[in-house]
A protein has these predicted regions:
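Short secondary-structure transition/capping segments
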Residues: 72-85, 120-128
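Terminal, regulation- and interaction-focused segments at domain boundaries
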Residues: 1-26
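Beta-strand/loop substructures that line and gate deep hydrophobic ligand-binding cavities in soluble
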Residues: 77-102
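Compact, glycine-rich, soluble single-domain proteins
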Residues: 29-78
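Well-ordered alpha/beta subsegment
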Residues: 100-128
């Protein structure tokens, strides 16, 4: 798992992620607000959101090679606030994940990692 600090709030970071995905024509399949869900059952949680997105063209090819990777797809980025009020993004290490499924030689894995890093760097204002 990769963790990277954001200069913005959870809501602003998530909004920036959504804008980037929209500009790249990458579909968003779901968004979860864990803090909101916790409040609905009377529990407290620091801001914590997850966005689920990806390209069926890419994911399908991986699942054709090993259907078990479907548990990892579509791609996800979590944006959360720690107990000190610092905001973080978390996203998978695709190369490690791919090796668990025998897919480390698939060229798309590196591209998926680059995409995740690009989205996170731009949304957190940590452009490299």
């Amino acid at each position: 798992m990769n963790n990277q600090a954001s200069k913005f709030s959870v809501d602003e970071t998530m909004g920036r992620i959504e804008q980037i995905l929209q500009k790249m024509d990458i579909p968003v399949f779901a968004k979860f607000d864990h803090q909101k869900n916790a409040k609905e059952v009377g529990l407290d949680l620091h801001p914590n959101q997850v966005i689920v997105f990806g390209s069926p063209k890419v994911g399908t090819k991986l699942m054709q090679e090993n259907p078990a990777i479907s548990i990892e797809l579509p791609l996800k980025i979590s944006v959360w606030e720690d107990k000190n009020g610092k905001v973080w993004t978390s996203f998978p290490q695709m190369e490690r994940l791919a090796s668990e499924y025998g897919l480390e030689k698939e060229p798309v894995i590196g591209k998926m990692q680059e995409l995740l890093e690009k989205i996170v760097n731009q949304s957190t204002d940590n452009n490299k």
